[in-house]
Structures are given as structure tokens and as C-alpha cells.
């Protein structure tokens, strides 16, 4: 009698389909002007696979009514209408704020036709995208590499009895060269009192003081201290008062009273007269028979000659 063992599987369950993690996903952003024409959307979906493509409205995304899954899309295509620039106008900062986190590293954003202007491109750059080949890409973040800082090597354990380290006696041995400086070992250093460095003779020695508060630079004016007790402040005040009094005295030399301004000023030389004794020196010539009539007064010592009834100065 022979026994045969059946090793076949009695229940054959179907293998679940494995999801292709490398499949790229696309996001189509349509303005209301494009979404109103069904034939345009049908033409777009004939190019993209419907199973890996999502369609969202730009106005709803701008208003915050739609939330996008993070780090999902490899391509973001903004549908445009040749008759209107509504799609470009709807690409505001709020749209980029919701759109950029949903893009994978290296994902691309572009228009169906044309390219973004300067202002729209600036908003994309401020959102973290990089301009490349007429579109914008999300840069790949490089992984941070940790740096290992070199520390001090741990010392091998030594025997406290004979001072043996790895079979070699280390008692009394020293390492030649310059060792590493460890700030942790200097935490217990005591501060030195500066007064302890002075002897008794140094403490008894009087401090040198400048005589009469004379500054080092003679060109600068001497300035007293705030609480001056050496008399320099009072001396400077007296000098200032004397200087002000002298300046006021110099001004009073040419000072005229109100009554003096109303009187006629006399510019003649007192005690001296002309040859005819009719007018004094410095006065105008008024006599009808005077040969100098009508002329200004002569200067002292000026030689005057009369030739052909003409005065020659």
C-alpha cells in the first residue's frame, strides 16, 4: 500500500496588485474660462493618463477651498486660454503657498502655452522654485552630512600599583611636544589679586598728580573737573568775565546816543582856517569870489595850482 502526499495548494488566492511607487503623478490647474469648455479638457486628458492625473480649479485653490496632498506631484501644468490671461492672473502668492508643498523635489511647474511674466515669475521664485527652461522647478534638498569633530583620545587604563600601561612603565614619563589645550581643565584656576603684587613701599608711595591741572596738550584749553577744588574753575570764570568786559568796552567807543544821531556831524578841522579866513579847512568852498568854489575840500598837504582859471590838483 503506497501513500502519496499532495503538496499542491488547495486555496489559490489572487495576488494583490502592487502599487508602482515610481509612477509619476500630474496636476492640471484649470481656470474657469478653460473649465467651461468640455472639449478642451477632453483634449488635455487624451494626452495624460487619467489614473495618474488630477484636475483642480485655480480659483478654488486660490480661495483656499482645496487642500493638496504634500509631496505628491511631479508635474504641475497650468492650462491656458489663448483668448484670456485669466490663468496667469490667478497665480497669486496664495496659490504658490498651497502648490509648492504638494510638489516633489525636482517637480516642474509650467504653462500649457507661453511662459510666466516678470511679476508672476518673481512670486514663483519667492515661493522657493527655481527658473529653468521656460518653467520652474522645485530644487532638490541635499541631505545634511554630519561632521565628526576630532576629540581627545581616551587614555588607556593604567595600573595604579606599578604604573604600567599596555605592558610599558609610564611612571615619570612625559610626552614631548605641545599638547592640546583643554579649557575644561582651567576652570579651577584662581584669579590673582593685583593688590597682593604690591609691596608696602609701593602702597605708601603717593600717587603722581599733574600740577595745577595742566593738561598734556598745551594747545587745548584747560578744562576744570566737574567738582573742581583746585581753583582752576574760578580762574577760568574770571578770565571769561575780563574778556567779556574788554569786548563791551571796545564796542562802547563807537556807540552813539539817540540825540547824537539827530545833530549834523562837523568834519572841519578845529582851529585852522583858509588863506582868506572865510572858511575853515575841510569845509566846502562857498564864497562867490573863491577860485575853489564848487570843489570838494582839499586833503591836508595837497598842492593846488590855478592855471587859466582852472584848478589843477
Swiss-Prot record:
Keywords: 2Fe-2S, 4Fe-4S, Cytoplasm, Iron, Iron-sulfur, Metal-binding, Mitochondrion. Its main location: cytoplasm. InterPro entries: Anamorsin, CIAPIN1, Dre2_N. Residues 1-25, 151-187 are annotated as: Disordered. A motif (Cx2C motif 2) lies at residues 287-290. A motif (Cx2C motif 1) lies at residues 276-279. Residues 146-203 are annotated as: Linker. It comes from the Eukaryota. Coiled coil: none annotated. Residues 276-290 are annotated as: Fe-S binding site B. [4Fe-4S] cluster binds at residues 276, 279, 287, 290. Residues 213-230 are annotated as: Fe-S binding site A. Its cofactor is [2Fe-2S] cluster; [4Fe-4S] cluster. It is found in: Cytoplasm; Mitochondrion intermembrane space. [2Fe-2S] cluster binds at residues 213, 225, 228, 230. Monomer. Interacts with tah18. Interacts with mia40. The C-terminal domain binds 2 Fe-S clusters but is otherwise mostly in an intrinsically disordered conformation. Component of the cytosolic iron-sulfur (Fe-S) protein assembly (CIA) machinery required for the maturation of extramitochondrial Fe-S proteins. Part of an electron transfer chain functioning in an early step of cytosolic Fe-S biogenesis, facilitating the de novo assembly of a [4Fe-4S] cluster on the scaffold complex cfd1-nbp35. Electrons are transferred to dre2 from NADPH via the FAD- and FMN-containing protein tah18. Belongs to the anamorsin family. This is Fe-S cluster assembly protein dre2. It comes from Aspergillus flavus (strain ATCC 200026 / FGSC A1120 / IAM 13836 / NRRL 3357 / JCM 12722 / SRRC 167). The gene is dre2.
Amino acid at each position: 500500500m503506497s501513500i502519496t502526499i499532495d503538496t499542491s495548494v488547495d486555496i489559490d488566492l489572487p495576488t494583490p496588485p502592487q502599487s508602482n511607487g515610481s509612477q509619476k503623478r500630474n496636476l492640471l490647474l484649470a481656470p474657469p474660462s478653460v473649465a467651461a469648455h468640455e472639449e478642451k479638457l477632453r483634449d488635455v486628458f487624451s494626452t495624460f493618463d487619467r489614473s495618474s492625473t488630477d484636475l483642480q480649479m485655480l480659483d478654488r485653490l486660490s480661495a483656499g477651498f482645496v487642500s493638496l496632498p504634500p509631496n505628491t506631484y511631479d508635474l504641475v501644468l497650468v492650462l491656458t486660454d489663448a483668448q484670456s490671461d485669466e490663468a496667469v492672473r490667478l497665480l497669486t502668492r496664495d496659490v504658490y503657498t498651497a502648490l509648492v508643498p504638494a510638489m516633489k523635489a525636482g517637480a516642474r511647474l509650467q504653462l500649457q502655452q507661453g511662459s510666466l511674466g516678470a511679476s508672476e515669475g518673481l512670486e514663483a521664485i519667492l515661493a522657493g522654485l527655481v527658473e529653468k527652461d521656460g518653467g520652474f522647478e522645485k530644487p532638490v534638498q541635499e541631505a545634511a552630512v554630519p561632521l565628526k569633530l576630532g576629540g581627545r583620545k581616551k587614555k588607556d587604563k593604567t595600573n595604579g600599583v606599578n604604573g604600567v600601561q599596555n605592558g610599558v612603565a609610564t611612571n615619570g614619563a612625559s610626552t614631548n611636544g605641545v599638547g592640546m589645550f583643554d579649557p575644561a581643565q582651567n576652570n579651577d584656576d584662581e584669579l590673582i589679586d593685583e593688590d597682593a603684587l604690591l609691596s608696602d613701599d609701593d602702597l605708601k608711595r603717593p600717587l603722581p598728580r599733574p600740577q595745577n591741572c595742566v593738561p598734556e596738550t598745551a594747545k587745548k584749553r584747560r578744562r576744570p573737573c566737574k567738582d573742581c577744588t583746585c581753583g582752576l574753575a574760578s580762574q577760568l570764570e574770571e578770565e571769561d568775565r575780563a574778556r567779556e568786559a574788554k569786548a563791551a568796552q571796545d564796542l562802547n567807543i563807537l556807540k552813539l546816543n539817540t540825540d547824537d544821531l539827530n545833530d549834523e556831524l562837523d568834519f572841519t578841522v578845529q582851529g585852522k582856517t583858509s588863506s582868506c579866513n572865510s572858511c575853515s579847512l575841510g569845509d566846502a568852498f562857498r564864497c562867490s569870489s573863491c577860485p575853489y568854489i564848487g570843489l570838494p575840500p582839499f586833503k591836508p598837504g595837497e598842492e593846488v595850482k590855478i592855471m587859466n582859471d582852472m584848478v589843477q590838483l
